[in-house]
């Protein structure tokens, strides 16, 4: 009743009491506000927005009311009737409109039957409004989640996946997809008819498309049937091919399943994961296989000689790097230097070939060598792997893997690395000299300074290797030697000289010839040619003769397998390139010529067996330079036709190498050279003589290369006889140069007849070590310095000066090649018949061919201990083992492997005659020099020690390498001219010649202390009295030639206690010597 009374009193009552009360209060409140708003509007103006009327002005009420719109509601009226309908809307007074209202409870039955569409109930008649089945959360919570809710309900929410069915075109009825019928509603033929009839256009369309294709002439002829049968047969074969079948299956199979099918995400992910796992597993397996192969290759590399070339290309970098590490890090520095050289080589040479060769060289040399080999470039590959370099590089790679290879290569290859670049052109010095060499070489005077520093760093690396010393000599030859050559060339005609080197690039030997540089001093052309083909014959072929060098390289590698004979063959090969190169050498240098000079220079550096005492070399160089000057004119006339003669001589030398007698002149000269190197291991002084001999010989080579092709052999013998210490080898060298004797020098490297070579004066002075000369000789040949070590024993090897060594090497090379360890017995013959070898160059070739066995056996006793070393340091052991002639001969075997270095070293000796004598002084009694000859087997330091101890000779091959490694640039300086020759850079410029010289001295040092190569290198000052005594005589002449180019550095080199007298004479050579010494020490 209370409620009713209240409703009656309220005109607007009709809803629920609560709603009405709110409505009333709101309405009342609205009215005053409206009034106020109106008054304010009247007073303030019409800007005031009119407010909503009635309930529309109540925001909260409107929110609740509108939420009910569209819902089914029951409206109770004051009359007691209840209507149910859809709440449609309401007015400002809250008059309610219902759709399809139905009277649930009515007093008037007749009305109940009527259902109007809309009924509006005034607000005052409504008592309550109740909404049924109303979701109070729908409007607020579910709206923005509609999509997500639908997705959750429909997509992927089903626990069971619907089975997928493939699409079947027949399911929807056959679909005609043919174009022939009027599927699209019109007939193409009708179109043609209409165009023809209406427009007069006739179509040439033919269903057979005969105008677009070539119809087959299917006749009944027999030919057509045969062709058809043949075609069907071929088609059947192709279709039956498993590969073809797989493709057809892929094309004709269920492409939808492969490319267009819908796959469950989980299944696809699983498959992808499985595929990823399989792929990862496959990659892991492949990586493991590659690693195993690499390890297997590394393991085989030290032992493989025949596959050395392949391995060097395939895995030389990997293996060599590893081996380089084993070598104790000098190789690494060597590599760094080498890479510098290679970079400079690129800059100076701008020749892809040099870099390519460098790469090849690195392959052989090893990873370190690869950089170094880059500098060697062609030198190591073409020349570096020359009998010495090849034997050394190959053997080293065989024995010590990369490390040994690096060292051995360094003697030939290492030097070659530098020399190669200089050989290609003066610029090649860069690769040799490292940074500045190529630049320095490009500029005659500047080259020395640049060459020295670059070589300094390079020397440091080279020193690390036994061959490093030799390498340094080569580097000096490339830079300093080039400088020496430039000294000669610069003094005389630096550019021509480089040209000479370019063409003599294969005769880069001039660099190898330490004496060769002095010769270059005497005659720039000859000096550049002075990279004695004979001496450099180990590596030179690589530089100048790109193809020939490669061929020679291959031959060298093959010969390396043959070890000692191969060096000779390589020498012959090298001689050929040099002969070819020698001719152009005289021509004005072009960029190509410079590049060739660089390559040749690298080769010459390889040849730089500076074993002959530098003084002897200088003397011989001076003598030979004079001769060469006379001969150069002849050669210049002959050089045009020089390559044929040189090639002939090369062939002869090769024949000598094979026959040893065919080219006894050239080959024996090489043998003599190689013997001096070889003997120098036995006798430090002897090695220097060969170097001097080589240097003059190199000059002679340039002057007389072609004339001397025949005459030089005699001349060499004569020189050897006249210049027992150095000159006889120089004639040989000259012959080699004229004949392109680099190969000859390679022939020398197999100094199987090395003992015969002992005839050089230095060798005479140092007869005692001769028993080991064969092995050492090869080593010394590879390592110019080791030869001088033999010097102490040369008294018996007096007979043949470095020339004697060279002459014996022909036989010696073969003998060595045949039996590298034969040297022990051969040394005595060498010293005794050393003189004979020079004269007996031919006989030495043939006789030593037979002799090597005896010498080999003599050396074998001591060498065998080295063979055991193979495991620890494969390269060193092999060089010492006489019975591992082929691989070890070139790389490890002091006899065979080092013989090629000896050949190279004699050339070195020639140029750095002054440096070598000083080296000889420090190394006079030290086998470390010989070890330097062994530097190719860088890891064979222990082997060198044991081999030298057992053999009684300096272990050139094994010892020198470690010595050089251990010795930093500074130690090498000490050994060479003075340990205080701190400025490696200075040495670097005269580096190449001096390195060659140093190589000779290093063998001398090695000879005194065969047991320990490192000690041997350090003792070089001690042997200086013993080996220095003989060498000083040669020192003045050689230094005079050497220092010309390296005036500044030479003095410091001269300042060294090793070569005080040489300094004034040939500062360049002394510098070179210092460089060589540094290299030697580093290798230690």
Curated annotation (Swiss-Prot):
Biased composition (Polar residues): 22-33, 312-331, 452-476, 484-513, 886-896
Compositional bias of kind Pro residues: 871-885
Keyword Cytoplasm in record: yes
Modified residues (Phosphoserine): 208, 211, 221, 266
Keywords for this protein: Cytoplasm, Developmental protein, Phosphoprotein
Superkingdom of source: Eukaryota
Pfam families: LsmAD (PF06741), SM-ATX (PF14438)
Biased composition (Basic and acidic residues): 265-300
Deletion phenotype: Second instar larvae lethal.
Molecular function per GO: mRNA binding; RNA binding
GO process terms (BP): chaeta development; circadian regulation of translation; compound eye development; compound eye photoreceptor development; habituation; locomotor rhythm; long-term memory; miRNA-mediated post-transcriptional gene silencing
Compositionally skewed regions (Low complexity) per UniProt: 384-403, 424-445, 540-584, 613-694, 701-711, 733-743, 754-765, 773-788, 796-812, 822-853, 1000-1017, 1066-1084
Family, similarity comment: Belongs to the ataxin-2 family.
Entry function: RNA binding protein that regulates various processes including circadian behaviors, actin filament formation, eye development and oocyte formation. Forms a complex with tyf and pAbp which functions in adult circadian pacemaker neurons to sustain circadian rhythms likely by switching between activator and repressor modes of post-transcriptional regulation via interaction with Lsm12a or me31B. Forms an activator complex (Atx2-tyf activator complex) via association with Lsm12a and activates the TYF-dependent translation of per to maintain 24 hour periodicity in circadian locomotor behaviors.
Subunit record text: Homodimer. In the circadian pacemaker neurons, core component of the Atx2-tyf activator complex composed of at least Atx2, tyf, pAbp, Lsm12a. In the circadian pacemaker neurons, also a core component of the Atx2-Not1 repressor complex composed of at least Atx2, tyf, pAbp, me31B. Interacts (via PAM2 motif) with pAbp. Interacts (via N-terminus) with tyf independently of pAbp. Forms a subcomplex composed of Atx2 and pAbP which can associate with the 5' cap of pre-mRNAs independently of tyf, Lsm12a or me31B. Interacts with Lsm12a and me31B.
Protein name (database record): Ataxin-2 homolog
Species this protein is from: Drosophila melanogaster
Lineage: Eukaryota, Metazoa, Ecdysozoa, Arthropoda, Hexapoda
């Amino acid at each position: 009743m209370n409620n009713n009374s209240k409703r009656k009193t309220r005109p607007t009552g009709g809803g629920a009491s609560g709603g009405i009360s709110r409505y009333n209060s709101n309405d009342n409140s609205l009215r005053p506000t409206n009034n106020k708003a109106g008054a304010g509007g009247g007073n303030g103006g019409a800007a005031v927005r009119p407010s909503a009327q009635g309930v529309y002005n109540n925001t909260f009420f409107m929110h609740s009311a509108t939420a009910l719109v569209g819902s089914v509601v029951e409206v109770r009226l004051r009359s007691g009737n209840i209507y149910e309908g859809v709440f449609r809307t309401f007015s400002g007074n809250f008059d309610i409109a219902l759709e399809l209202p139905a009277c649930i409870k009515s007093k008037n039955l007749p009305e109940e039957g009527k259902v109007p569409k809309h009924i509006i109930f005034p607000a005052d008649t409504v008592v309550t409004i109740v909404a049924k089945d109303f979701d109070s959360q729908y409007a607020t919570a579910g709206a923005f989640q509609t999509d997500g809710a639908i997705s959750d309900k429909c997509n992927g929410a089903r626990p069971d996946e619907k089975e997928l069915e493939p699409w079947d075109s027949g399911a929807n009825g056959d679909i005609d997809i043919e174009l022939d019928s009027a599927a699209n509603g019109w007939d193409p033929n009708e179109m043609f008819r209409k165009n023809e009839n209406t427009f007069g256009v006739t179509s040439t369309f033919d269903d057979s498309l005969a105008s677009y294709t070539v119809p087959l002439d299917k006749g009944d002829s027999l030919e057509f049937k045969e062709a058809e049968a043949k075609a069907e047969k071929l088609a059947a074969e192709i279709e039956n091919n498993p590969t073809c079948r797989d493709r057809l299956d892929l094309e004709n199979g269920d492409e939808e399943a492969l490319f267009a099918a819908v796959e469950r995400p989980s299944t696809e992910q699983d498959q992808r994961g499985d595929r990823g796992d399989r792929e990862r597993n496959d990659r892991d397996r492949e990586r493991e296989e590659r690693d195993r192969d690499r390890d297997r290759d590394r393991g085989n590399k030290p032992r493989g000689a025949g596959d050395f070339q392949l391995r060097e290309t395939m895995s030389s970098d990997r293996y060599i790097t590893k081996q380089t590490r084993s070598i104790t890090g000098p190789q690494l520095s060597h590599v760094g230097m080498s890479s510098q050289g290679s970079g400079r080589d690129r800059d100076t040479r701008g020749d892809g070939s040099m870099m390519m060769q460098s790469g090849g060289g690195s392959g052989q040399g090893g990873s370190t060598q690869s950089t170094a080999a880059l500098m060697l470039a062609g030198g190591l590959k073409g020349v570096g792997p020359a009998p010495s370099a090849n034997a050394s590089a190959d053997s080293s790679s065989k024995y010590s893997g990369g490390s040994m290879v690096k060292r051995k290569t360094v003697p030939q290859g290492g030097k070659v690395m530098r020399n190669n670049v200089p050989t290609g052109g003066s610029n090649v010095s860069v690769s040799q000299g490292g940074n500045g060499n190529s630049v320095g070489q490009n500029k005659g005077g500047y080259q020395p300074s640049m060459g020295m520093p670059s070589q300094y760093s390079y020397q440091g690396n080279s020193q690390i290797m036994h061959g490093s010393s030799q390498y340094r000599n080569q580097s000096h030859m490339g830079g300093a030697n080039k400088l020496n050559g430039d000294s000669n060339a610069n003094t005389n005609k630096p550019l021509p000289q480089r040209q000479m080197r370019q063409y003599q690039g294969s005769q880069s030997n001039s660099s190898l010839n330490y004496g060769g540089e002095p010769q270059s001093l005497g005659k720039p052309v000859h000096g550049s040619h002075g990279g004695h083909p004979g001496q450099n014959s180990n590596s030179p072929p690589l530089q100048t003769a790109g193809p020939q060098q490669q061929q020679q390289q291959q031959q060298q590698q093959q010969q390396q397998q043959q070890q000692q004979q191969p060096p000779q063959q390589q020498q012959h090969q090298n001689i050929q390139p040099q002969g070819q190169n020698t001719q152009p050498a005289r021509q004005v240098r072009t960029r190509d010529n410079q590049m060739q000079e660089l390559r040749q220079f690298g080769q010459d550096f390889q040849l730089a067996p500076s074993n002959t005492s530098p003084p002897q070399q200088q003397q011989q160089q001076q003598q030979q330079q004079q001769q060469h000057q006379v001969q150069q004119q002849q050669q210049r006339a002959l050089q045009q036709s020089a390559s044929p003669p040189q090639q002939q001589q090369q062939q002869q030398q090769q024949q000598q190498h094979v026959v040893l007698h065919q080219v006894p002149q050239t080959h024996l000269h090489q043998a003599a050279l190689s013997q001096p190197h070889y003997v120098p291991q036995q006798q430090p002084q002897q090695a220097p003589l060969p170097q001097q001999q080589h240097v003059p010989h190199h000059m002679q080579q340039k002057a007389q290369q072609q004339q001397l092709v025949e005459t030089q052999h005699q001349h060499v013998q004569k020189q050897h006889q006249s210049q027992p210490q150095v000159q006889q080898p120089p004639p040989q060298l000259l012959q080699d140069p004229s004949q392109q004797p680099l190969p000859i020098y390679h022939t020398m490297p197999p100094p199987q007849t090395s003992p015969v070579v002992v005839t050089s004066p230095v060798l005479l002075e140092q007869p005692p070590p001769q028993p080991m000369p064969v092995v050492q000789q090869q080593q010394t040949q590879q390592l110019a310095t080791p030869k001088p070590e033999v010097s102490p024993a040369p008294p018996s090897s007096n007979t043949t000066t470095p020339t004697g060594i060279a002459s014996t090497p022909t036989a010696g090379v073969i003998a060595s090649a045949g039996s590298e360890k034969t040297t022990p017995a051969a040394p005595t013959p060498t010293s005794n018949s050393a003189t004979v070898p020079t004269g007996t160059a031919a006989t030495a070739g043939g006789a030593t061919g037979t002799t090597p066995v005896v010498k080999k056996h003599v050396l074998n006793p001591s060498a065998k201990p080295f063979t055991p070393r193979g495991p620890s340091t494969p390269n060193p052991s092999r060089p010492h083992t006489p019975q591992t002639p082929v691989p070890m001969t070139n790389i490890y075997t002091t006899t065979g492997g080092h013989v090629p270095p000896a050949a190279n070293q004699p050339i070195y000796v020639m140029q750095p005659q002054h440096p070598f004598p000083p080296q000889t002084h420090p190394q006079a009694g030290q086998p470390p020099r010989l070890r330097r000859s062994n530097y190719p087997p860088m890891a064979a330091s222990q082997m060198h020690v044991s081999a030298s101890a057992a053999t009684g000779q300096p272990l050139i091959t094994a010892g020198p390498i470690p010595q050089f490694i251990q010795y930093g640039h500074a130690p090498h300086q000490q050994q060479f001219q003075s340990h205080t020759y701190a400025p490696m850079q200075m040495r670097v410029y005269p580096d190449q010649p001096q390195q060659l010289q140093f190589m000779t001295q290093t063998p001398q040092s090695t000879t005194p202390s065969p047991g320990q190569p490192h000690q041997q290198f350090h003792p070089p000052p001690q042997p200086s009295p013993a080996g220095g005594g003989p060498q000083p005589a040669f020192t003045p002449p050689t230094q005079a030639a050497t220092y010309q180019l390296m005036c500044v550095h030479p003095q410091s080199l001269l300042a060294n206690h090793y070569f005080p007298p040489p300094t004034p004479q040939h500062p360049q050579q002394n510098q070179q010597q210092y460089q060589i010494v540094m290299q030697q020490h580093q290798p230690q």
